[in-house]
């Protein structure tokens, strides 16, 4: 298993990099939280990796810290969360922000991430709670500090109609920011989910 790579960063195009190590080029996919911590092109970089072997491909996922990799490995053990969604989650929030979401049972923030529906968010909260507790208990002081570091702000409380409308727009491929903006602009007190979805869609056409 490939657990760590150190080499020259020869290509950077989010979320993928090409790292040259001893004459070999390794294609590595990274969460944006790690990607933006990388040095400039042609500089030396060290990353911690997770190696996935599938029938049709061999994939490397890279992280700046061992702690972020450890969290990724816990995420992909959650039912319904594969490497792609795990990468998306860690691109949308830091490790510390994710830990804070789980500690506060914050479904509203999790469902704003692309690909994370209400059921997946609920599974994450249930399945990750004990796993994170165990990870934090076994982490050294600096590692624990990293995992808890965040600029976490709970998502504002919204009513069911707004949640349903945002979820519907996300399922159609709109970005979280676009969906939230359109729903907020279209919302009127007493609107049903169906009417709010229709009004939000009209404003985006």
UniProtKB/Swiss-Prot annotation:
The entry sums up its family as follows: Belongs to the RuvA family.
Region of interest: Domain I = 1-64
Gene Ontology, cellular component aspect: cytoplasm; Holliday junction helicase complex; Holliday junction resolvase complex
Domain description: Has three domains with a flexible linker between the domains II and III and assumes an 'L' shape. Domain III is highly mobile and contacts RuvB.
| GO BP of this protein | DNA recombination; DNA repair
Query: What is its subcellular localisation?
Result: Cytoplasm
Quick one: where's region Flexible linker?
Answer: 144-156
- Establish whether keyword Transcription is in the entry: no
> Which stretches does the entry tag as region Domain II?
65-143
What's this protein's function? The RuvA-RuvB-RuvC complex processes Holliday junction (HJ) DNA during genetic recombination and DNA repair, while the RuvA-RuvB complex plays an important role in the rescue of blocked DNA replication forks via replication fork reversal (RFR). RuvA specifically binds to HJ cruciform DNA, conferring on it an open structure. The RuvB hexamer acts as an ATP-dependent pump, pulling dsDNA into and through the RuvAB complex. HJ branch migration allows RuvC to scan DNA until it finds its consensus sequence, where it cleaves and resolves the cruciform DNA.
- Subunit annotation: Homotetramer. Forms an RuvA(8)-RuvB(12)-Holliday junction (HJ) complex. HJ DNA is sandwiched between 2 RuvA tetramers; dsDNA enters through RuvA and exits via RuvB. An RuvB hexamer assembles on each DNA strand where it exits the tetramer. Each RuvB hexamer is contacted by two RuvA subunits (via domain III) on 2 adjacent RuvB subunits; this complex drives branch migration. In the full resolvosome a probable DNA-RuvA(4)-RuvB(12)-RuvC(2) complex forms which resolves the HJ.
This one is known as: Holliday junction branch migration complex subunit RuvA
> Quick one: where is this thing mainly located?
cytoplasm
């Amino acid at each position: 298993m490939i657990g760590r790579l150190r080499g020259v960063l020869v290509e950077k195009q989010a979320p993928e990099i090409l790292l040259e190590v001893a004459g070999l080029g390794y294609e590595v996919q990274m969460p944006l939280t790690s990607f933006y911590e990388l040095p400039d092109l042609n500089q030396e970089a060290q990353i911690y990796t997770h190696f996935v072997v599938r029938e049709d491909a061999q994939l490397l996922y890279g992280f700046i810290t061992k702690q972020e990799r450890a969290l990724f490995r816990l995420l992909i053990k959650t039912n319904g969360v594969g490497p792609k969604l795990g990468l998306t989650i860690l691109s949308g929030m830091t490790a510390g922000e994710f830990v804070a979401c789980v500690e506060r049972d914050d479904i509203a923030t999790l469902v704003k991430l692309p690909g994370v529906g209400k059921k997946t968010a609920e599974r994450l909260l249930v399945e990750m709670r004990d796993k994170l507790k165990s990870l934090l208990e076994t982490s050294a002081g600096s590692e624990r500090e990293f995992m808890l570091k965040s600029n976490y702000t709970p998502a504002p409380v919204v009513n069911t109609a707004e949640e349903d409308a945002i979820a519907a727009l996300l399922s159609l491929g709109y970005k979280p920011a676009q969906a939230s903006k359109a729903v907020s602009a279209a919302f009127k007190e007493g609107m049903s989910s169906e009417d709010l979805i229709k009004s939000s869609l009209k404003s985006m056409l």
